Every structure is written in structure tokens, then in C-alpha cells.
Amino acid sequence: MNSTGHLQDAPNATSLHVPHSQEGNSTSLQEGLQDLIHTATLVTCTFLLAVIFCLGSYGNFIVFLSFFDPAFRKFRTNFDFMILNLSFCDLFICGVTAPMFTFVLFFSSASSIPDAFCFTFHLTSSGFIIMSLKTVAVIALHRLRMVLGKQPNRTASFPCTVLLTLLLWATSFTLATLATLKTSKSHLCLPMSSLIAGKGKAILSLYVVDFTFCVAVVSVSYIMIAQTLRKNAQVRKCPPVITVDASRPQPFMGVPVQGGGDPIQCAMPALYRNQNYNKLQHVQTRGYTKSPNQLVTPAASRLQLVSAINLSTAKDSKAVVTCVIIVLSVLVCCLPLGISLVQVVLSSNGSFILYQFELFGFTLIFFKSGLNPFIYSRNSAGLRRKVLWCLQYIGLGFFCCKQKTRLRAMGKGNLEVNRNKSSHHETNSAYMLSPKPQKKFVDQACGPSHSKESMVSPKISAGHQHCGQSSSTPINTRIEPYYSIYNSSPSQEESSPCNLQPVNSFGFANSYIAMHYHTTNDLVQEYDSTSAKQIPVPSV
């Protein structure tokens, strides 16, 4: 297609006319360059629109359905209704408006497109774009309010949230309808470029003001959230101030110690001002108490408090990274269209470059709608993992690689050599393969085993696990480090040790390290016999 034909039909966008004194070969060269640039723009926009249609439709569809499927999640707060509204707007943009825009790209003017199609595209694109952006701005203001602690105990009621959503829909589509009615039928089927002069300019100016205000609100809000979280993370990195005072209750007080212990508190601010460390300390205490009557030492509570502080610091750091990603995505995806719209409002004559800029700006706005479910939803990490898994699976299919297993031998030699070794030889591998029953072995560093053959009853493991040095197997094959305090096994009773207590030292954070020892049925049989010998377990 000829790009000059686009510009002749588009208002405020005139082709680059060549003076009559120049030769015809320079004119043809310039037209050829314009055709090349326009073709590159079409190819780039088409590729991005294909990605938007696939990933954006998938992500928004999953997020939208999760609010109606009881097997997924439900509203944690009433304001989660805004996430539902955002997913619906973005789903319509990615699944309907983006394919319509792809159809518009490959036609020179609106004269070759049906009027009903062009009217529908005008209304849906301009309406859903500003509606999605307003919803993102409202979510940003709500999160900023929660982080700054403005009335943290008072959440928005469900009727108020619904009324706010209806107000956003009314304002957005009123402006979109006015802009659609003021379009010219003889120009390009683009929402903003086809506005006629006069009242069309006034509506376009109002649309630009609304668009710019929403972008500014989102950017400033998440910048303030990132600064607040960064300050909280810096404060938590300082050594905690431990004070003991049993006479009066203090904020951020720890779990009271039974049997004469003193409550422990820390002068550390929480992420939200209505949040303290009681819940975190409760999570930490559950992993190390065998019974409710067991005493908790002050050193153990102190270690739990330090672990809670480290967890909050890590969460603040991840939240800061998320805020930076949100700000960059908003600026990169919204600024090109905003600049082109401002240029259309301020100048009566456009240019070929401005027209290409506007096409690319609309594509980036649609691309932002495809990114929203991977950023704003509570299951965004799961969606990203699924997409990465699909990409890896496709890559393996292209390269025809065999799927690798998670267990790999770490010792010298191949598996056949290790399999043929006798039981008294030391292989120093991550796992041992032998047809003969082994009497001296433990689970490996690649993860705890939850199979039926490797499980021991809780009574046996509780009464006959000893801590001592082993002379046959290196200690590095017996320890499994975990770098998260969350339980990574299906059942806490089977995975957490029952005889290990936190050490009175700050050198090791025991909430981040778990020791898993499992034996096989051979150990169960040895326990039943009178001549059984217990396997010594190394101490930390």
C-alpha cells in the first residue's frame, strides 16, 4: 500500500510535499523511504498485536474467571472488584479491539471500511482505553492510601465500590460517545485522528487532559509507594531495638512467653501502619514448638523476630521492584500516544512521522492492557510462571531436546559405576542407586522425599532421632537449605524436625534452614529387631 494515500486522507497529517524545483527522482526516493518506514511500522504493530491477542486474552480471561470460580479465590477486600473491572476492560481490548485495529491498519481510508465497523471501533477503543487507565489510577490511589496508613481500618464498602465503578464507566463512555459522534467519515478510521475541527478539537482536548491526568496519577502514586517501601526496608535493616517491659503493653509486642518469660518487642515500623509482627511471629513459632505447653526461650523469640524483620524487608524490596515496573510500563506505553494527541491538538498540520507515531502509540496502549493481568492481579506470579513454562516447552519442542530430570548425580563417575559399587563404598553422590538394600544412607540435598517407602512414623522419628556426628557420609549430603520460611512440603508434621531447637545465636537464622532426615523401610525393620543400630544424625 502507499503511505502517502494514508496521509492525504488523514486530517492534520499532510504528506511531505517536495518543492517543484526539485527533480522527480528525489520525489520518488522520498516516497520510497516513506513506504519503507510505513511497512516497518505495520510489521512491528502487527507482531505486537498478535502477542497482545494471545497473551493478553489468556491472562485477562484467567483473572476474570477466577472471581467466579469458587475453586480459585474470592474477594479479599471489597476493592478487589476494581481488579475484576480492570480485567474485563483489558479482556475486551485484547480480544476484540486489538483485532479490529489490525484490520484498520491494512486499509488506506475509512471509505473502504463499513461505517458500522468504524463507529464500533471508535467507540470501543476510545472508551475502553480511558476506562482501563482510570481503573488503574483508582487502584494506584487505593494502594497509596493503604501504604501511607490513611484510615487503614476502614475499607471501602461494596456499594461504594460499585458506585465508583459505575461513575468511571459513565464518564469514560460519555466522552468516548461524544468523540465518536464528532468524527469525519472521509478520514482514517482512527479514534483521535478522525476528529473534525471545531467541537471535535474541544472534545479531543478534554480527552487529552483526562488521559494525561490518569497517567500522572498512576506514575506519582507508585513512585510515592516505592519511596515509602524503600524507607521501611532501610529502617528494618538496622539492628532491632529489643526492650523488655512487662508492666505495660507496647506496640509491635511479640508473643508472651509462658512460664515466666517476658514479652519482646521491636521498634520497627510495619509495611502498613495497622500491621504488627504478631502474625509473623505466630507463623515462626509454629515450626519449632512441639506442644502448646512447651516453653519458648527469649533467644528463640528474638530469632523469630529477626526472621520476621528479614521477611518484611524482602517483601518490601520485591514491592519496590513491582512499583518500578508499573511506572515504566505506564510511561513507555502511554507517552507515545499522549505526545501524538497533544501534537494533533496544538498544530493544525501534521507530518508523516507523527502519523506513524500515532499508530505505534495505539499499539502500545493495547500492549499495556495485555500486561495488566501479569502485574496487578494477586496471581500474577502464577500467570508469569505458566507463560514461561509454555515458552520453555515450545523451545524444547523446536530444539527436540529431551526433558531433563530434577535429580542428577553430583559425584564422580557415571551412574553405572555408582550402581555397581558395594554398600560400604562411599560414592559422595546426590543419590545412591543399588539393587542391594542399604543400611547407611540418608536423603539427598536435592529435596526431601515424600514417598511411602521413605517415610517413618512420627512416633519412631520422634523417639529415635539423635544428633551426633557421622563418620561414613559427608555432612553436605545430609543438609537441605531452604531460603524461605514458608513450609515447602505438603505436610508440616512430616517435613519439619521435631527435635531441633533454635540455637542461641544470630549467626544462623534457623527459620531459613530446615533439616530433613528420612530413612527407608530398612530402618523400620532394624528398629523392630533387637539388634538394630541407630544411624547418627549430624548436628548443625
From Swiss-Prot:
Domain of life: Eukaryota
Molecular functions per Gene Ontology: C-C chemokine receptor activity; G protein-coupled receptor activity
Region of interest (Disordered), ranges: 1-27
Cytoplasmic-side segments: 68-86, 142-160, 227-318, 372-540
Tissue-specificity statement: Expressed at high levels in brain and spinal cord and at detectable levels in retinal pigment epithelium. In situ hybridization of adult eye sections localized transcripts only to the perivascular cells, surrounding retinal arterioles, in the ganglion cell/nerve fiber layer. Also expressed by islet cells (at protein level).
Coiled coil: none
GO BP term, pick one: G protein-coupled receptor signaling pathway
SUPFAM superfamilies according to UniProt: Family A G protein-coupled receptor-like
Effect caused by changing T135P: Found in a patient with age-related macular degeneration; uncertain significance
UniProt function note: G protein-coupled receptor that is activated by the chemokine CCL5/RANTES. Probably coupled to heterotrimeric Gq proteins, it stimulates inositol trisphosphate production and calcium mobilization upon activation. Together with CCL5/RANTES, may play a role in neuron survival through activation of a downstream signaling pathway involving the PI3, Akt and MAP kinases. CCL5/RANTES may also regulate insulin secretion by pancreatic islet cells through activation of this receptor.
Name of this chain's protein: Probable G-protein coupled receptor 75
Gene this protein is translated from: GPR75
